[in-house]
């Protein structure tokens, strides 16, 4: 059936999927803040809805809290966004995020061996379309060097290439699908 005349693809049942995830304990970070506890440590989360669709609205800081200060007792603040647009990344860094997790780019999807992504499908530099770098980017970080994020004004950025492809370009070239498992350890 033609549920979406723009793409001729069926509309995904995202609301039902979200409701099932929430029932299972998932955190909905669409334009929200929340916390989780892992190994007895509090982790602060801040997220936005899909910036590619202009659905993002950076969540306000609660009265009496400092954006960079974060949740009381949190050991780390993690920003989560589907699409790593620069405006969102800048807001997350200004908010005190130390790590930002993103997707959307499919790793560039069409890459050249030895060069990498040709495009990022957002305003992120193509060299940052997948993997770990820093934001704001340093020259070394976007060329896969070991540039550490500073304590203030910079965050680690991890963009997953993901498993799928764009419905408009359903092929990958020199860009393997990936599911990422990150392990965070104390400094």
Describe these PLM feature segments.
Residues 1-56, 68:
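Extended active-site neighborhood of metal-dependent phosphoesterases/phosphodiesterases
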Residues 84-180:
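Conserved beta-sheet core of the metallophosphoesterase superfamily
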Residues 1-5, 82, 104-106:
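Histidine-centered active-site/metal-ligand motif
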């Amino acid at each position: 059936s033609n549920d979406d005349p723009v793409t001729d693809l069926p509309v995904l049942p995202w609301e039902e999927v979200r409701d099932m995830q929430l029932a299972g304990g998932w955190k909905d970070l669409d334009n929200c803040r929340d916390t989780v506890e892992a190994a007895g440590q509090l982790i602060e989360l801040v997220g936005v809805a899909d910036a590619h669709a202009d659905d993002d609205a950076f969540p306000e800081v609660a009265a009496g809290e400092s954006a960079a200060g974060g949740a009381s007792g949190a050991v780390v603040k993690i920003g989560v966004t589907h699409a790593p647009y620069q405006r969102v990344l800048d807001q997350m860094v200004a908010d005190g995020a130390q790590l930002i997790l993103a997707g959307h780019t499919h790793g560039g999807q069409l890459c050249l061996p030895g060069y990498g992504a040709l495009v990022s499908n957002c305003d992120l530099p193509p060299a940052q379309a997948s993997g770990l770098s820093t934001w704001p980017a340093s020259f070394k970080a976007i060329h896969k060097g070991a540039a550490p994020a500073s304590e203030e004004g910079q965050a680690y950025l991890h963009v997953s290439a993901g498993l799928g492809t764009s419905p408009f370009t359903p092929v990958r070239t020199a860009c393997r699908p990936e599911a990422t498992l990150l392990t965070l350890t104390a400094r």
